[in-house]
């Protein structure tokens, strides 16, 4: 295709990013070039923007980042048959090898050689982005581009919540009400949970959790989550605890509040080792602890589509800000302060 485009680039090994003009990516015979309509800011992007310890170890500058997006196919490689120019799409952002043991046994989401869009390859905070054709997901023509751009993080929430087979009529606790935690509240409601506790220190996000279906919100700064959960459940504990915060104290509390025989699903990424009481909080309780990474390909995407198209999940309350790409610094400031749900950048 050729030409130039605007993109947000992590240009230096320091805080912040730069809006630059760079070449439009060229594609190979199995790739697709997409004109980005909407790109949402993820917690991973904030790590990169802040240049924290994780980013310093993981990111090689210069790097175009961003990975949650929707757009229109602008060009296809000569071997691509599953999509065509003009198709309205989003994409699975974990690029897998297809040849390792996990891939060959259907566990693509834990591929040994995963590469991530906007982390290992040029990302979607740009006017154009390229992805492998096999990663492209076609969107309904009437889906709002902002909503279409957040299907990937909704997939994280869906994977976290729906791994439990015992949620209908049961109880769920969502610890950490960032955007994916908020989505998990909505998914738990759609899955039939009768009691949903949302736990955070941010009153703004707890209010959003209430709108999305939380039956009780717990401000961890103002009350003891374990005491509230004990009262709420009559001492029985929570059937499914979803840990989205990554804070060591919250992780330990989450294990304690889980019911005997319950489940503890962890999507969060603690920045340091966590000390927990495995004997009493896991072994003697018969607790199932499961790490969650990415989305099952493409089972989770089908679940996401069903939840959105059926109206069982409405992400309108989660999408709180839409800004032009040029105002990315304002978007990152909102994310860093926690005074937002999902922030969408429009190229």
Curated annotation (Swiss-Prot):
Residues the record marks as active site: 44, 47
Residues where Zn(2+) 2 binds: 97, 100, 103, 111
Cell location: Cytoplasm
GO cellular component, one term: cytoplasm
EC number(s) from the headed UniProt entry: 1.1.1.103
Ranges that cross the membrane: none
Keyword set, alphabetical order: Cytoplasm, Metal-binding, NAD, Oxidoreductase, Zinc
Binding-site list for NAD(+): 180, 200, 205, 267-269, 292-293
GO biological process terms, semicolon-separated: L-threonine catabolic process to glycine
Disulfide cross-links: none
Catalysed reactions listed for this entry: L-threonine + NAD(+) = (2S)-2-amino-3-oxobutanoate + NADH + H(+)
Cofactor binding note of this UniProt entry: Binds 2 Zn(2+) ions per subunit.
SMART domains in UniProt: PKS_ER
Residue sites binding Zn(2+) 1 per the record: 42, 67-68
Main location, first listed in the record: cytoplasm
Enzyme class: oxidoreductase
Signal peptide stretch: none
A Pfam family matched in the record: ADH_N
Pathway: Amino-acid degradation; L-threonine degradation via oxydo-reductase pathway; glycine from L-threonine: step 1/2
MF terms in GO: L-threonine 3-dehydrogenase activity; zinc ion binding
Subunit composition and interactions: Homotetramer.
Function of the protein: Catalyzes the NAD(+)-dependent oxidation of L-threonine to 2-amino-3-ketobutyrate.
Family indicated by similarity: Belongs to the zinc-containing alcohol dehydrogenase family.
Protein name: L-threonine 3-dehydrogenase
